[in-house]
Amino acid sequence: MNREELFDVTVIGGGPAGLYSAFYSGLREMKTKIIEFQPQLGGKIHVYPEKMIWDVGGLLPVTGDKLIEQLVQQGLTFQPEVVLNTKVESIIRNKDGTFTLKANDGKEHFSKTVIVATGSGILKPQKLSIEGAERFEVSNLNYTVKSLKRFKDKTIIISGGGNSAVDWANELEPIAKKVYVTYRKEELSGHEAQVKQLLNSSAECFFHTSITKLIAGDSHEAIEYVELTNHETGEVSHLLIDEVIINHGYERDITLLENSELDVAIIDNFYIAGNANSESSVDGLYAAGDILKHEGKLHLIAGAFQDAGNAVNKAKQFIQPDASEYGMVSSHNEVFKKRNRELIKQMMK
């Protein structure tokens, strides 16, 4: 291993937690690398590019697309090395205390510390388990909502009852011709305010009910009817629809930690068990964002930023024990003086 190949911090995951980790790591003058499985940075926010995000402190409501743009710009401030289309498959602890990260392309990445910021895992939506469903994915069977305009004045059925399903139903209800929601349980499990909004809207909900069949139109290329089955009564009904949206969550990929030789404590067979300082059970390995679990964890994008800052601070002290516990705030940091002057000049034009 060449010393040039050894990074201070390697961040696995390029979503909000990973991008802020990269920014703050650069702020603390550490050589940083981001490894992301997807072909672009941004993480799960790519699933809802037109959704309005309200809960990032100091930001007015912003679309997912715009937030990604700003996060990426900030994350690349200190020019971290970015590796895309790459899956880290295992982490090994070397005799000298550094880490080797083995990727799916056969390459190895070397780092003094690691921050795992993989969120809810590699984005792989749970597909509808109906024979032949995949052929409609090119027409009107959707697992994400990338454009609200696509659904304007259409009759839509959404399968699912969690936060994503409820949020999309609320977003689409004002612009669609009709919105139906079908859920296998007796009540929706999304956030209380959003559930109340949906139940008080024109959307129609079917409980204890699932989509059991997709019926194509004369062209055989798109779904024209869905068959619904009530699991309590056995009643079968059919709905004429234009679009089907499936929100059944995402499959969790836990192979990274399963394949690693590290004794990382796990909660619920997926999450990294940590503490409020983003430390895991392995020295030098930290977690940030949705993958981290501990008592008092804040499950918001804003919480991911705090996780990231804590992880970077601990990584800095792991590498340099006499380093300060926290980085200097940006308003007084010499690193930003030149950048601030340039920004002020632009503002004065």
From Swiss-Prot:
<comment type="similarity">
    <text>Belongs to the ferredoxin--NADP reductase type 2 family.</text>
</comment>
<feature type="binding site">
    <location>
        <position position="88"/>
    </location>
    <ligand>
        <name>FAD</name>
    </ligand>
</feature>
<dbReference type="InterPro" id="IPR050097">
    <property type="entry name" value="Ferredoxin-NADP_redctase_2"/>
</dbReference>
<feature type="binding site">
    <location>
        <position position="123"/>
    </location>
    <ligand>
        <name>FAD</name>
    </ligand>
</feature>
<dbReference type="Pfam" id="PF07992">
    <property type="entry name" value="Pyr_redox_2"/>
</dbReference>
<feature type="binding site">
    <location>
        <position position="36"/>
    </location>
    <ligand>
        <name>FAD</name>
    </ligand>
</feature>
<comment type="subunit">
    <text>Homodimer.</text>
</comment>
<feature type="binding site">
    <location>
        <position position="44"/>
    </location>
    <ligand>
        <name>FAD</name>
    </ligand>
</feature>
<feature type="binding site">
    <location>
        <position position="48"/>
    </location>
    <ligand>
        <name>FAD</name>
    </ligand>
</feature>
<dbReference type="GO" id="GO:0050660">
    <property type="term" value="F:flavin adenine dinucleotide binding"/>
</dbReference>
<keyword id="KW-0521">NADP</keyword>
<dbReference type="GO" id="GO:0004324">
    <property type="term" value="F:ferredoxin-NADP+ reductase activity"/>
</dbReference>
<keyword id="KW-0274">FAD</keyword>
<dbReference type="GO" id="GO:0050661">
    <property type="term" value="F:NADP binding"/>
</dbReference>
<keyword id="KW-0285">Flavoprotein</keyword>
<dbReference type="InterPro" id="IPR036188">
    <property type="entry name" value="FAD/NAD-bd_sf"/>
</dbReference>
<dbReference type="InterPro" id="IPR023753">
    <property type="entry name" value="FAD/NAD-binding_dom"/>
</dbReference>
<protein>
    <recommendedName>
        <fullName>Ferredoxin--NADP reductase 1</fullName>
        <ecNumber>1.18.1.2</ecNumber>
    </recommendedName>
</protein>
<keyword id="KW-0560">Oxidoreductase</keyword>
<feature type="binding site">
    <location>
        <position position="331"/>
    </location>
    <ligand>
        <name>FAD</name>
    </ligand>
</feature>
<dbReference type="InterPro" id="IPR022890">
    <property type="entry name" value="Fd--NADP_Rdtase_type_2"/>
</dbReference>
<feature type="binding site">
    <location>
        <position position="290"/>
    </location>
    <ligand>
        <name>FAD</name>
    </ligand>
</feature>
